[in-house]
């Protein structure tokens, strides 16, 4: 270790700094996360949503594919809309219509410009004002907003069911018919969508920006990029480019001597090393890797086709069995699996070479056990994805065995 002491200390120092930053900002994410109110209620005492119903709604959203079907707060697939941005915009338009009917007896589009400006200003104030009370856990909404929420929820209830009026919309969004069959779970999911929109519109205490830092862009309530958005967006690019430039400069000018071109060996060194039992056992890993890679490529074409025909494959309605959210899930997960399996196989192949051409104790047994563990994870997670999106799996099992809905971490938590 003596020759590499400086490098070891450099590596340890880098790890300490980076993991300290990761831990600090990871804790900050939880500390500054938007609160989930115990109740969303009106001044008249009507309870619209509760803490538990919002979380149940999140589970319902995860079970239909989560980020693989639209997105939340901008993180996910965009074949369907971002549900936060879409809900917020629709709710705002509904608020304007409800308020106009109450104040003027006609839709918002039919009142004069001065009256429209007054209602827009009232709406902006109402939506950006934080009515959440941390002591009681209650967030209050006006009766006008409650009616707007109900009208917005009705649209989503029809969208995620099989209402004929929204068939073309579902096709454009690559959603299967009756995406979420249970009316109760659809209502819960609406609560989750509302909460994400509430956080996107409500100002964080002590600031003039919302909990999501004024995301999404929504001119109706003044959601525009903050100064911090602009500064840190530019700074991140500048720092990245400066870092790359420093690395190039350091490599070119800080080295004490040029490295000599390596001389190729006369013979392939691997061909002179007899394979150990554990290395021979790695052959089945290659079949798994090739199978997953082929599966990923085929699913990539299948997924891309859904952008043309949202529910069909060359005229055949396959969405009831293999909807867009499922094949996109499998497409991404199969890529992660074959890449991870390839790294595992490479590392396991090199271990005996590093060990002087001999297998470490129980190496072959470990290779075999790990392979079957991979098979169980792949088959189990794919089956769980299917059963969740098909709404066959019980809701309470979805998180652990079905679909977590986080795009690159879709497999159930147990897997």
Regions found by a protein language model. Name each.
Residues 1-50:
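Post-cleavage N-terminal segment of exported redox proteins
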Residues 8-27, 61, 69, 206, ...:
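Hydrophobic cores of alpha-helical transmembrane segments in multi-pass integral membrane proteins
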Residues 51, 62-66, 267-277, 317-320:
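Short linear interaction motifs
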Residues 88, 97-98, 353-355, 362-364:
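Short, charged/polar low-complexity linear motifs in solvent-exposed/disordered segments
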């Amino acid at each position: 270790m003596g020759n590499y002491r400086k490098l070891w200390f450099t590596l340890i120092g880098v790890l300490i700094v980076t993991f300290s930053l990761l831990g600090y900002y990871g804790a900050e994410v939880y500390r500054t996360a938007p609160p989930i109110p115990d109740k969303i209620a009106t001044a008249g005492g009507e309870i619209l949503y509760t803490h538990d119903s919002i979380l149940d709604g999140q589970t319902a959203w995860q079970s239909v594919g989560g980020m693989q079907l639209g997105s939340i707060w901008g993180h996910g697939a965009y074949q369907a809309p971002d549900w936060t941005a879409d809900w917020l915009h629709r709710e705002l338009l509904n608020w304007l219509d409800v308020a106009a009917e109450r104040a003027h007896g006609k839709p918002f589009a039919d009142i004069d410009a001065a009256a429209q400006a007054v209602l827009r200003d009232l709406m902006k104030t109402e939506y950006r004002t934080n009515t959440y009370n941390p002591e009681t856990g209650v967030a209050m909404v006006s009766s006008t907003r409650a009616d707007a929420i109900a009208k917005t929820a009705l649209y989503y209830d029809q969208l995620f069911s099989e209402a004929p009026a929204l068939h073309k919309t579902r096709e454009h969004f690559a959603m299967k018919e009756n995406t979420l069959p249970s009316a109760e779970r659809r209502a819960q999911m609406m609560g989750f969508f509302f909460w994400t929109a509430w956080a996107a519109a409500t100002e964080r205490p002590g600031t003039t920006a919302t909990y999501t830092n004024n995301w999404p862009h929504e001119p109706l309530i003044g959601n525009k990029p903050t100064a911090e958005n602009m500064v840190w967006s530019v700074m991140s690019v500048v720092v990245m480019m400066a870092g790359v430039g420093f690395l190039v400069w350091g490599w070119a000018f800080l080295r004490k001597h040029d490295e000599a071109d390596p001389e190729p060996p006369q013979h392939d060194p691997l061909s002179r090393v007899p394979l150990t039992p554990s290395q021979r056992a790695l052959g089945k890993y290659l079949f798994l890797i090739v199978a997953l890679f082929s599966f990923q490529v085929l699913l990539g074409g299948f997924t891309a086709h859904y952008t043309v025909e949202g529910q069909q494959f060359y005229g055949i309605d396959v969405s009831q069995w293999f909807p867009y959210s499922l094949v996109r899930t499998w497409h991404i997960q199969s890529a992660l699996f074959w890449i991870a399996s390839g790294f595992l196989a490479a590392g396991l192949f090199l271990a005996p070479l590093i060990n002087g051409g001999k297998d470490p104790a129980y190496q072959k047994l470990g290779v075999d056990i790990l392979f079957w563990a991979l098979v169980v994870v792949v088959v189990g997670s794919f089956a769980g994805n299917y059963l969740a999106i098909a709404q066959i799996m019980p809701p309470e099992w979805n998180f652990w065995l079905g679909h977590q809905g986080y795009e690159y971490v879709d497999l159930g938590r147990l897997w």
